[in-house]
């Protein structure tokens, strides 16, 4: 696949571009050396580069720009600022070998790994990811979703490959907003989004009026995969996928089917009883993990926990304990580390579900907040707007 004029892979050649700042849009000069391709696909190509000005690593994602439309990914990334979302440093346009082709280049914060790769490292050694790491990563994913969902944005492609990690510090950041969209009630959306294995059942049923709850289903699938070492609902097609879901959750009732897509209510499905999750997972998986999973993997979208509700689940209580330390499972000789910042909530985040703040924020973390919880007046949550 031709992705336009290639970014030369030459660690000694300095490339200069006139770019715009990811936050302010101000014009700035960017100088970098490029080292290697770290990803490619139908969207384009991702290069790892070294920024001269800041003496830091970054990733440049290059995508072909359709001149008829504004790039939704760029518009969304420019307004997203969160500790668990990859940061847009700058952006610029280049032309391809064919002068009609215009490429958008997103200069992004660099993270060394994906949760997909981290999970594979354990699987190859016939090990399970330590439960504390599962808690840490899923909590941070939920925190990023609480933030984007409150802004009206649905990611629509939650999967292990789109969850970036800094395994040294236990930090997770959500990336790839190429499928993301501001969902507006009453406006139809395409159902053929989200990668298989992680697709919510309403998408398999072809629903076009789905909600942010599709991201919660995908999160449940990712969490299950980290504990199992393989996808919970593998399937080569939509029907395959549905069969795998039914094998575990049982046949959806007519009422449940109605909440996903009323057009399928008269469809006859084989009657299969649900299987207890305790039979699907090993005995080492704690009951509170299975309880959280069951509350995210519900057929009826409105029955699924919201991201903020899920963060309050007892499964994550260990993260709220000030004595919890993160052991380096890749280097057992290294001394345990403190957990990353998990409670540095902004006033916006504290306004998402003010009724949950007391449960969400442990007492030892409250003094560091930008506001006093007892006196906090929630700010109005405004949905994100893009032209």
Curated annotation (Swiss-Prot):
Reaction(s) the record says it catalyses: L-seryl-[protein] + ATP = O-phospho-L-seryl-[protein] + ADP + H(+); L-threonyl-[protein] + ATP = O-phospho-L-threonyl-[protein] + ADP + H(+)
InterPro entries according to UniProt: GSK-3, Kinase-like_dom_sf, Prot_kinase_dom, Protein_kinase_ATP_BS, Ser/Thr_kinase_AS, STKc_GSK3
PTM entry text: Autophosphorylated on tyrosine residues.
Location of the Protein kinase domain: 32-316
Top EC class for this record: transferase
A Pfam family matched in the record: Pkinase
Record-annotated active site: 157
One GO MF term: ATP binding
Keyword Transferase carried by entry: yes
Modified residues (Phosphoserine): 191, 335
UniProt family annotation: Belongs to the protein kinase superfamily. CMGC Ser/Thr protein kinase family. GSK-3 subfamily.
Matches recorded under PANTHER family: GLYCOGEN SYNTHASE KINASE-3 ALPHA (PTHR24057), PROTEIN KINASE SHAGGY-RELATED (PTHR24057:SF0)
Protein name: Protein kinase gsk3
Naturally occurring in which organism (per UniProt): Schizosaccharomyces pombe (strain 972 / ATCC 24843) (Fission yeast)
Gene: gsk3
């Amino acid at each position: 696949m031709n992705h336009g004029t290639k970014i030369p892979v030459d660690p000694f050649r300095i490339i200069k571009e006139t770019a715009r700042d990811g936050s302010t849009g101000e014009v700035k000069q960017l100088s970098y050396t490029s080292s290697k391709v770290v990803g490619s696909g139908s969207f384009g190509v991702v290069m790892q580069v070294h920024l001269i000005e800041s003496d830091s690593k970054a990733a440049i994602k290059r995508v072909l720009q359709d001149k008829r439309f504004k790039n939704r990914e760029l518009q969304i990334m420019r307004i997203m600022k969160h500790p668990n979302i990859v940061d847009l440093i700058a952006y610029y346009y280049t032309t391809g070998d064919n002068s009609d082709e215009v490429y958008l280049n997103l200069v992004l914060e660099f993270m060394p790994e994906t949760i997909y790769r981290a999970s594979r490292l354990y699987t190859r050694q016939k090990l399970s990811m330590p439960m504390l790491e599962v808690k840490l990563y899923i909590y941070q994913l939920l925190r990023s979703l609480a933030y984007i969902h409150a802004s009206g944005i649905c990611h629509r492609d939650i999967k292990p490959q789109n969850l970036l990690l800094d395994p040294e510090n236990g930090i997770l950041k959500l990336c790839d907003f190429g499928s993301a969209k501001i969902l507006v009630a009453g406006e139809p959306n395409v159902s053929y989004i989200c990668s298989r294995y992680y697709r919510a059942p309403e998408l398999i049923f072809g629903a076009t009026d789905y909600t942010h709850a599709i991201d919660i289903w995908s999160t449940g699938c990712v969490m299950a995969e980290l504990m199992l070492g393989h996808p919970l609902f593998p399937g080569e097609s939509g029907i395959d996928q549905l069969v795998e879901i039914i094998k575990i959750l049982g046949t959806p009732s007519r009422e449940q089917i109605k909440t996903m897509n009323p057009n399928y209510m008269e469809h006859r499905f084989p009657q299969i009883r649900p299987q207890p999750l305790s039979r699907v997972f090993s005995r080492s998986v704690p009951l509170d993990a299975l309880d959280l999973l069951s509350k995210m993997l519900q057929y009826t979208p409105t029955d699924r926990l919201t991201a903020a509700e899920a963060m309050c689940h007892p499964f994550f209580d260990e993260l709220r304990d000030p004595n919890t330390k993160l052991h380096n499972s890749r280097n057992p000789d290294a001394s345990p580390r403190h957990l990353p910042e998990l409670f540095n909530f902004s006033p916006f985040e504290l306004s998402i579900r003010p009724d949950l703040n007391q449960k969400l924020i442990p007492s030892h973390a409250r003094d560091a907040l930008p506001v006093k919880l007892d006196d906090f007046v929630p700010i109005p949550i405004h949905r994100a707007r893009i032209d």
